[in-house]
Amino acid sequence: MDIKQLLLSIILTVSVVNGRGRRINIYGAENGKSDIVQLRGPAEQLVYSSPIRERRPIFRNALLSNSPLRWSKMQDLDGNYLIPYVISGNYDTVERDTIKTAMEKIANNTCIRLIPRTNQPDYAEINNKKGQGCYASIGRFPGKNVVMLESNDDQSCIQEDTVIHELFHVIGLWHEHMRADRDAFINVLYKNIEPAQYPQFEKLSSRDATTYSVPYDYNSVMHYDENAFAKPGKISMMTKDSKFQKVIGHPKDASSNDYKKVCAIYHCSKCMHQDFQQIVEQEHIELNNPIITNAPVQQGDSCTDRLGICPMLKSREMLNCKVMATFCCSSCSAPTSTTTTTSGTPSDGSLWQRIKSIFQ
């Protein structure tokens, strides 16, 4: 093989590995307002005038193991939880293989199995639309659950770690830096962040957050990088342990702690090819959760919303109370005339118009 053939071979190999387009930074402005559907709404969805929150949304590091948002309706004969999916986007063979590899890694390390959809009413739809970036909703909502993985000659979400990250959102994981204990591990530099982006750095109280006592993990595939949503030339986060400053947000794969939290959500019998109960006992993972019933939460003659997005959905006329009453009791019970509306109604071409079918 002469030098020209060798160089051509290297170029072709790199092209196949990198796929189409440049990598989309899921933690930057180029990816829209967030890679989580519930955080992609207008900034007024959560009201912030400072790093101190003015009202408390119900966000968690990981879903409770008895959350109604788990994919718990279907199991196979081995007790694995099934998430039906369809790939409706246009992807090439290499990209489809990358998506399938990400699914296989999750299956090999947890009790979650992503299976091709037949006629199941609740499912994940993996789609590819130019200009949409990478995003997914947290947990299972009725009907279609969008997993947007844009890929074209300009830019792409199809890297194994990014696909795993978005699938973990669907399964039930939020971002690592949102944990209640994050201040012991990182400093969020609010002076370097536009106020409209403060919701991306919401810290949860220990009463709200569920970490299952799994240690904070700089290597998590769910961790933001140091520049996430920062002003140009600035960083938004500084790690307390300096050797991890350039590590956060740059994983090549899910960490063992990521898999442990998924296993905790679904009470898997096996986790990373080990008996999960042994892992629980050895690492003191906490599986006990507050009881969540399937009925609306009643307080006297009133009831409360169990999802922080309920008021926003109602104000946008996107709240379908036939299917969401269990989660949005207060918003569904309140007269429409008393609902606080938000200025700046989205146009027909806005993101919320495009994704509102998720909630209907």
From Swiss-Prot:
It is an enzyme of class 3 (hydrolase). Its cofactor is Zn(2+). This is Zinc metalloproteinase nas-5. The lineage of its organism: Eukaryota, Metazoa, Ecdysozoa, Nematoda, Chromadorea. The gene is nas-5. Residues 61-269 form the Peptidase M12A domain. The active site is at E166. Zn(2+) binds at H165, H169, H175. GO terms for biological process: nematode pharyngeal pumping; nematode pharynx development; proteolysis.
